[in-house]
Design a protein with these regions (language model features):
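ATP-dependent carboxylate activation and anion-phosphoryl transfer catalytic cores
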Residues: 56-137
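Intrinsically disordered, low-complexity proline-rich regions
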Residues: 1-2, 125
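Phosphate-binding site of ATP-dependent enzymes
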Residues: 3-67, 93-95
C-alpha cells in the first residue's frame, strides 16, 4: 500500500503535443469544481466544473508548470499527445498527480480545449495526431 499526504490546491491540466519533432506545451487549463473537490462527479457531470483556459496564473507560475509538464513528457519518453495533471498549492508549489498518455479527445475534453486556446481547431488536432501515429508505423 502506498500512502501520501493529500495535496490541496488548484487543479491544473497541461497538454503537451508533439510538433516538429519536439514537445509543444499548450495553454494551461484550470478545473474549478462547483463543489468542494474535483472528484469523479465533478469531472464527468455536466455543469459540475468550470474550465478556465488559459488558467488565471501569473507568467512565472505559468512558465513553471508548463516547463514541468514538458520535462515529464520528455522524461517518460512520451510521443503524440499527453495531459499532465497537477495540483498548485497556495504556496505556489506544483505537484504532478498523473501523466495521461491517452487523454480524452472529445470536443469537450481538456486537451481539445487547450488546443483551441492555442489556435488549433478540433479537426486539425485530430489530423495532426493521426499523421504522427502514421509516421510511427
Amino acid at each position: 500500500m502506498y500512502k501520501r499526504q493529500q495535496v490541496v490546491g488548484r487543479e491544473l491540466a497541461i497538454a503537451v503535443l508533439e510538433q516538429d519533432g519536439g514537445p509543444t506545451v499548450l495553454p494551461v487549463v484550470e478545473a474549478v469544481p462547483v463543489g468542494d473537490v474535483y472528484d469523479f462527479e465533478a469531472r464527468y457531470e455536466a455543469g459540475a466544473t468550470h474550465l478556465v483556459c488559459p488558467a488565471d496564473l501569473d507568467s512565472e507560475t505559468t512558465a513553471k508548470v508548463m516547463g514541468l509538464a514538458a520535462e515529464a513528457f520528455g522524461a517518460l519518453g512520451c510521443s503524440g499527445c499527453a495531459r499532465v495533471d497537477m495540483i498548485l498549492t497556495s504556496e505556489g508549489e506544483a505537484s504532478i498527480l498523473e501523466l495521461d498518455t491517452v487523454p480524452g479527445l472529445t470536443q469537450t475534453s481538456l486537451v481539445p480545449q487547450a488546443a483551441e486556446a492555442a489556435g488549433i481547431g478540433f479537426e486539425a488536432l485530430l489530423e495532426q495526431l493521426l499523421k504522427l501515429a502514421l509516421t510511427r508505423n
